[in-house]
Amino acid sequence: MLTNEISENEKPREKLLNYGIESLSSSELVALIIETGTKNESVLTIANRIIMKFKNVAEMQYASIEEFQLVNGIGVAKASKIMAAIELGKRISIVTEQEEVVVRCPEDAVKLVMPELAFLFQEHFHCLFLNTKNQVIYRQTIFVGGLNASIVHPREVFRLALRKSAASIMCFHNHPSGDPAPSSEDLLVTKRLAEAGNIVGITLLDHIIIGKNKYISLKEKGYF
């Protein structure tokens, strides 16, 4: 079915106006973003192809512009629109989290980072920076790649913490294997971070390892 053959009630824009944005499927949302189909395919057909390319919609946030362009019917203009929409959503999410979230326990923090870290194919070392009320004031990925003591240097972590006037930090990294069990390097990095935090007066509240839909809090396990 081509774009001009889609009935009025089936068009994503009309569906949004009649029933609200929540009524749209992921494919329909993408169709609204890319706007047009091709001579031979409707915008919904192309949008559905994009959704099917990824295991879940969350994985789209890690795709490059080249990966989107591998989808038949997607050129640089449409790929750019998709990436812009994803980036805007990420920025809104971060601002909302920073304004509202108080971290009272590891589970509170995991809810913030699990969607971002759980399905990555490389290790990412990520930090939350908190004020004296345990509110998140900033967050950032500090390192990407294999976690070891020579790469994850406390200096880089606490330089940013001092710049943001953080009272404490929580650190996270993912295990692409899905198994969150800590390695000896994980424990060494944690020890060095905790010691550095004591020196500069910024507490390391926890170092949490993220697996596939599960995690391990090194603080809860008594590793530091």
Swiss-Prot record:
A motif (JAMM motif) lies at residues 173-186. Residues 102-224 form the MPN domain. GO terms for molecular function: metal ion binding; metallopeptidase activity. It comes from the Bacteria. Keywords: Hydrolase, Metal-binding, Metalloprotease, Protease, Zinc. Zn(2+) binds at residues 173, 175, 186. InterPro entries: MPN (IPR037518), RadC_JAB (IPR025657), RuvA_2-like (IPR010994), UPF0758 (IPR001405), UPF0758_CS (IPR020891), UPF0758_N (IPR046778). One of its GO terms (biological process) is proteolysis. Belongs to the UPF0758 family. This is UPF0758 protein LMHCC_1020.
